[in-house]
Amino acid sequence: MSNFAIXLAAGKGTRMKSDLPKVLHKVAGIPMLEYVXRSVGAIXPXKTVTVVGHKAELVEEVLTGQTEFVTQSEQLGTGHAVMMTEPILEGLSGHTLVIAGDTPLITGESLKNLIDFHINHKNVATILTAETDNPFGYGRIVRNDNAEXLRIVEQKDATDFEKQIKEINTGTYVFDNERLFEALKNINTNNAQGEYYITDVIGIFRETGEKVGAYTLKDFDESLGVNDRVALATAESVMRRRINHKHMVNGVSFVNPEATYIDIDVEIAPEVQIEANVTLKGQTKIGAETVLTNGTYVVDSTIGAGAVITNSMIEESSVADGVTVGPYAHIRPNSSLGAQVHIGNFVEVKGSSIGENTKAGHLTYIGNCEVGSNVNFGAGTITVNYDGKNKYKTVIGDNVFVGSNSTIIAPVXLGDNSLVGAGSTITKDVPADAIAIGRGRQINKDEYATRLPHHPKNQ
């Protein structure tokens, strides 16, 4: 029989106090709903249907191509949301997973175990439960003397005795698909919220003598539903611990994992060393034996093997093997650094390609440049790429030496093996093998300093 999945993602999430739909708030780099979609993939569903509502177009954009969508125009409860999938799923034979889109910590392994438990026990419905010492706010699992699940009671509808129960409903279920849609026709809104509860389906199955089971999570953290910013921060913390643990098991060294922030899709090779306060975001890839020191921040970039990045920022760029960057350098988007390049302190590179073994040791701006190999930038070199309206390109050949405090005004090209004298302003192309000097001649005026008021003779 086939597996199906329904993801509930229609709610606004009022307690988040945000214009963004709740399920689109990010945890470790991706929306919560994306985590749910990835975990659901573990059960290999033949059909996945996502129920959208508030700002549906934003939610659909995140899961385009991964699911079918139905709209819940009025948020009338979880049962009502599942009813919206009827045109797609009703009448199909199989097992249907129902899961909330705000549960980013649930793992694919747990969902696979839930489905297997449901099938092996021949249940018509299976509730995914968890145990906690602080069950406030959760629906409680009410069992009979034989430990069979009888019903789920929501917090607002629970008696004082039921509120003491520590086994809680995680909001995730598996149902016999055909029986699910039959039972949904018999639920009503006679409850404190005036909504259609998916949990009422469990009571219907019990009344008809059908088998209802409960599978308990091994890790309570997986049950976390994010309803406010406090829970979002908790989910972020748990996910980052998982991520860092995975990398450590794979051979990455962390000086202080609790102070290191790595997004879920970052790839890190073995033997990388990561100091505290390092942030790696997006689709970043780090090569083997690279060192990332305190304060380094890398976004959507590829860093090769054996690089050393010292307290610097790299954005949407590629850094080859053996490169050294920093401290206090900034590699801005669309830049590429060739092997063994050195970018030193207070150097900014933007939209530029830099060839192998080139060095810019300090206080340099390289913008919109194509730089060859074995180039040396003296301290204080500026490539002037903007005239107030347009950006222009500078092309610098191989083995070029640029003296300190030089200004290179684009568009201009410096030929191979050329040299720019210190303090020059370059406005014209420099031929290969030439020396360019663009500064005023030095003039010494003898004894002139004696006329100045600060001279010792005038004190």
From Swiss-Prot:
The gene is glmU. In the N-terminal section; belongs to the N-acetylglucosamine-1-phosphate uridyltransferase family. In the C-terminal section; belongs to the transferase hexapeptide repeat family. Acetyl-CoA binds at residues 379, 385-386, 404, 422, 439. UDP-N-acetyl-alpha-D-glucosamine binds at residues 8-11, 22, 72, 77-78, 139, 154, 169, 227, 332, 350, 365, 376. GO terms for molecular function: glucosamine-1-phosphate N-acetyltransferase activity; magnesium ion binding; UDP-N-acetylglucosamine diphosphorylase activity. Its EC number is 2.7.7.23, 2.3.1.157. GO terms for cellular component: cytoplasm; membrane. Residues 251-459 are annotated as: N-acetyltransferase. It catalyses: alpha-D-glucosamine 1-phosphate + acetyl-CoA = N-acetyl-alpha-D-glucosamine 1-phosphate + CoA + H(+); N-acetyl-alpha-D-glucosamine 1-phosphate + UTP + H(+) = UDP-N-acetyl-alpha-D-glucosamine + diphosphate. PANTHER family: BIFUNCTIONAL PROTEIN GLMU, NUCLEOTIDYL TRANSFERASE. InterPro entries: Bifunctional_GlmU, GlmU-like, GlmU_C_LbH, Hexapep, Hexapep_transf_CS, NTP_transferase_dom, Nucleotide-diphossugar_trans, Trimer_LpxA-like_sf. Residues 230-250 are annotated as: Linker. The keyword Protein transport does not apply. GO terms for biological process: cell morphogenesis; cell wall organization; lipid A biosynthetic process; peptidoglycan biosynthetic process; regulation of cell shape; UDP-N-acetylglucosamine biosynthetic process. Its main location: cytoplasm. Pfam families: Hexapep_2, NTP_transferase. It comes from Streptococcus pneumoniae serotype 19F (strain G54). This is Bifunctional protein GlmU. The keyword Cell wall biogenesis/degradation applies. Catalyzes the last two sequential reactions in the de novo biosynthetic pathway for UDP-N-acetylglucosamine (UDP-GlcNAc). The C-terminal domain catalyzes the transfer of acetyl group from acetyl coenzyme A to glucosamine-1-phosphate (GlcN-1-P) to produce N-acetylglucosamine-1-phosphate (GlcNAc-1-P), which is converted into UDP-GlcNAc by the transfer of uridine 5-monophosphate (from uridine 5-triphosphate), a reaction catalyzed by the N-terminal domain.
